[in-house]
Design a protein with these regions (language model features):
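Conserved hydrophobic residue
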Residues: 25-26, 118, 142, 146, ...
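Amphipathic alpha-helical packing segments from all-alpha helical-bundle domains
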Residues: 64-67, 71-72, 97-100, 116-142, ...
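Amphipathic C-terminal alpha-helical segment
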Residues: 93-97, 107, 111-114, 135, ...
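Short, structured helix-loop boundary elements
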Residues: 9-10, 30, 52, 56, ...
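Short coil/turn segments at alpha/beta junctions that flank glycine-rich nucleotide-binding fingerprints
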Residues: 22-26, 76-77, 98, 143
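Generic hydrophobic, amphipathic alpha-helix propensity
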Residues: 8-17, 33, 58-62, 66, ...
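Hydrophobic alpha-helical connector segments
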Residues: 57, 68-100, 154-158, 181, ...
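Helix-turn-helix
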Residues: 11, 19-53, 57-58
Length: 210
C-alpha cells in the first residue's frame, strides 16, 4: 500500500512539474493541477499539505530522477571518454525534462519562497553533475588520455554552459539544441587536447578543401 501511495504521489508531481514549468508557481493552483490529473482537489490534499508542499515534492522528485540517471551513467562506464560522451548524449535525450526542471528551479530561485530541503536538493544535483565531469576528467588526465587541466574548473564551465543551452532552447525559437550540445562537447575536448572522431573528420575535410 505504501508503494502504491508513493507511486500515486509521484504521478501527481509529474503533472505538477509540467504546469509549473509551463507557467510558474504563483499562477498555478491546486485546482489546475487536479483538473490536469483528472482528480478532485481532495485527493491532492490527501498527499500534500498545500501547494508549497506539492511544489517541494515536485522539485525533489524531478531532481531524484535526474540523479538516478547520473548514477546509472557512472555504473555503465569505466572509460572516462565514454562516460563524458554518454553524459552529453543523456542530457540531449532527456533535454525536454531537463528544461522543465531548469525552468522550475529558475522560477524558484527568483521567488520569495525558501525551502531548505529544495535548496539542498538543488545543490546536491549540481554537485553530482560536476563530480561526474571532474572525476572523469581527472581519471583521463591520470591515464594520459587528456592534457593537464583543472578538472573542477572545466566541470563547472560545462555545467554552467549546459544550463545556458537549456535556457536558450526555451527562449529562442530558432535555437538548435543538437548543434549547441555538440559545440560544447567539442570545446571540452579541445580544452583537454582530445580530438573525437567527429572533430578529426572535420579537420580532415577542412584539410582536403584547403
Amino acid at each position: 500500500m505504501k508503494n502504491a501511495t508513493k507511486s500515486r504521489a509521484v504521478e501527481l508531481t509529474v503533472t505538477a512539474l509540467d504546469l509549473f514549468a509551463e507557467r510558474d508557481f504563483a499562477s498555478v493552483t491546486i485546482k489546475d493541477i487536479a483538473n490536469a490529473c483528472g482528480v478532485n482537489t481532495a485527493l491532492i490534499y490527501y498527499y500534500f499539505e498545500n501547494k508549497e508542499d506539492l511544489f517541494r515534492a515536485t522539485i525533489e522528485n524531478a531532481i531524484t530522477e535526474a540523479l538516478e540517471n547520473y548514477t546509472n551513467l557512472r555504473k555503465r562506464h569505466d572509460d572516462p571518454v565514454d562516460l563524458i560522451n554518454d553524459w552529453f548524449d543523456t542530457n540531449l535525450e532527456l533535454s525536454g525534462s531537463i528544461r522543465k526542471l531548469v525552468k522550475v528551479m529558475l522560477d524558484y530561485s527568483g521567488s520569495r519562497i525558501s525551502i531548505s530541503s529544495i535548496d539542498s536538493e538543488i545543490n546536491n544535483f549540481y554537485d553530482v553533475e560536476r563530480s561526474i565531469l571532474s572525476d572523469s576528467i581527472r581519471r583521463g588526465i591520470e591515464q594520459g588520455i587528456f592534457h593537464a587541466a583543472d578538472p573542477d574548473r572545466l566541470a563547472l564551465f560545462v555545467s554552467t554552459h549546459l544550463d545556458g543551452i537549456m535556457v536558450a532552447a526555451m527562449i529562442r525559437k530558432d535555437f538548435n539544441l543538437d548543434t549547441a550540445m555538440a559545440d560544447l562537447r567539442e570545446i571540452l575536448w579541445f580544452h583537454l587536447g582530445f580530438l573525437s572522431d567527429r572533430i578529426q573528420t572535420r579537420h580532415r575535410q577542412d584539410g582536403d578543401t584547403a
